[in-house]
Amino acid sequence: LVLDSGLYAGVWGSNVDFDANDNIELDYYGGYSRETGALSYDLGYIDYNYPGGSGDFEEWYLGLGITAGTVDLGATFSFGLDNANDNIELSAGTELSGIGLGITLGDYDNSGKYTVVSASKEIGGLELSLAWSDFDADSGNSSDEDAVTFTVAKSF
């Protein structure tokens, strides 16, 4: 749900495989975002849930962005609640021949660093995305992971 005022709320879900009890992730989120010329900002809250598992957590985030020509640059700062890890993320994106291209670099405090490289295209009202992700753990609390993900999304 997105309102003209800039307020938004939603639910996001996916399958996961963190341990034997975690097989689904359901996130509830809301916030306020605005664009003013080439600048944008987004202040929001996310509640991450793993029904039947453990590891639920919440965070507040502040995202800042700027468009420079055909390139979008962004930085997001996430503040974990109740001992959840903080996160800083830098991103860049552009469009080339109708295909969106992006890269994201991030660092979760005391957990690990990650990179995501993606390509996306809208076809018939569906957003198709192909991404490669790499997570390098800082300690034994997490494990290194690489993945290739294909996503089909539809916004209402």
Predicted features and spans:
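Outer-membrane beta-barrel proteins
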Residues: 1-156
